[in-house]
Amino acid sequence: MNTTPVHALTDIDGGIAVDPAPRLAGPPVFGGPGNAAFDLVPVRSTGRETLRFDFPGVSVGSAHYEEGPTGATVIHIPAGARTAVDARGGAVGLSGGYDFNHAICLAGGASYGLEAGAGVSGALLERLEYRTGFAEAQLVSSAVIYDFSARSTAVYPDKALGRAALEFAVPGEFPQGRAGAGMSASAGKVDWDRTEITGQGAAFRRLGDVRILAVVVPNPVGVIMDRAGGIVRGNYDAQTGVRRHPVFDYQEAFAEQLPPVTQAGNTTISAIVTNVRMSPVELNQFAKQVHSSMHRGIQPFHTDMDGDTLFAVTTDEIDLPTTPGSSRGRLSVNATALGAIASEVMWDAVLEAAK
């Protein structure tokens, strides 16, 4: 775990000047040519760098359309895995939401991008040679971000792009940064002129036999925070070179009796995958625990202007040892400890997305 500060300097107004270099999204167009205007060809997303992870039975693929740019990222678990879904905020974009999945599809394109998940479903049916027995049904749940504000087209992830992301899926690799569903993700949308591009991020932790993989596409109203309290992405003032916590903008607006400004069209979508067996109650609480923890790295989070979804997935491969007194009612201390560790892995993933 890297806890090194990102050279943060707090000024008296609450702004935080930081390094990395700014990556402004620019004012939105909210329109432009759509899918039919282009001869769209899915591209395998490579991103800024590749995370290598050791999680047998889990593959990840990312694809995008350069013309968007927008994309889709698929987490494929051929054997299937139990899933809990935690969705919060005012504008959730979700399909499926099943408690057992063979794939999770994350995509751009707002509600239109849910079509990518249908492409994943169709491709999995083809792999079954169109067998449709109930026990063989391939389940896919999808979540989307609203990424039109960071680009000038109406291109969205369609069935072909979802299918391509699945075809590109390989074990043990995840493209970090501007790739897949994170191609046009952005953060810090108090004002469009201060919005910055993010991306998709992942982090992996192995502790003995325990494996945890976190995947996230942060596209929030809020800014991205590091563990030292520095703002590493979002709400960047190009004139002053300062990234500023939105709370100071809101405080000033209320003090001057003005309506606070916040832009609509925001979502953070994520998945936390482990091999630890949990009861349904524990898995649901695990999802809530990790999702709630993300407010440390994204501030504000779960707002009325956001639509945040987290998928908690377990492959049910190992049981953690129990100790006397480790259970209280239906909840286990083991699941609580796992959630605490997974929360740190997810924060690492958020920071990777912001690099």
UniProtKB/Swiss-Prot annotation:
Protein name, entry field: 6-aminohexanoate-oligomer endohydrolase
Pathway: Xenobiotic degradation; nylon-6 oligomer degradation
GO biological process: nylon catabolic process
One Pfam family in the UniProt entry: Peptidase_S58
Reactions catalysed: [N-(6-aminohexanoyl)]n + H2O = [N-(6-aminohexanoyl)]n-x + [N-(6-aminohexanoyl)]x
The keyword Membrane appears for this protein: no
Top-rank taxon: Bacteria
Post-translational modification: Expressed as an inactive precursor that is cleaved autocatalytically at Asn266/Thr267 to generate an active enzyme composed of an alpha subunit and a beta subunit.
EC number: 3.5.1.117
GO molecular function, one term: aminopeptidase activity
Active-site feature positions: T267 (nucleophile)
UniProt xrefs under CDD domains: DmpA_OAT (cd00123)
Subunit-level organization: Heterotetramer composed of 4 alpha/beta heterodimers.
Entry's family note: Belongs to the peptidase S58 family.
UniProt keywords, alphabetically: Hydrolase, Nylon degradation
InterPro entries linked: ArgJ-like_dom_sf (IPR016117), Peptidase_S58_DmpA (IPR005321)
Annotated source species: Kocuria sp. (strain KY2)
The keyword Hydrolase is assigned to this record: yes
pH dependence (record): Optimum pH is 7.0-8.5.
PANTHER family: BLR5678 PROTEIN (PTHR36512:SF3), D-AMINOPEPTIDASE (PTHR36512)
Protein task: Involved in the degradation of nylon-6 oligomers. Degrades cyclic and linear oligomers of 6-aminohexanoate (Ahx) with a degree of polymerization greater than three by an endo-type mode. Cannot use Ahx cyclic dimer or the Ahx linear dimer.
Stored SUPFAM superfamilies: DmpA/ArgJ-like (SSF56266)
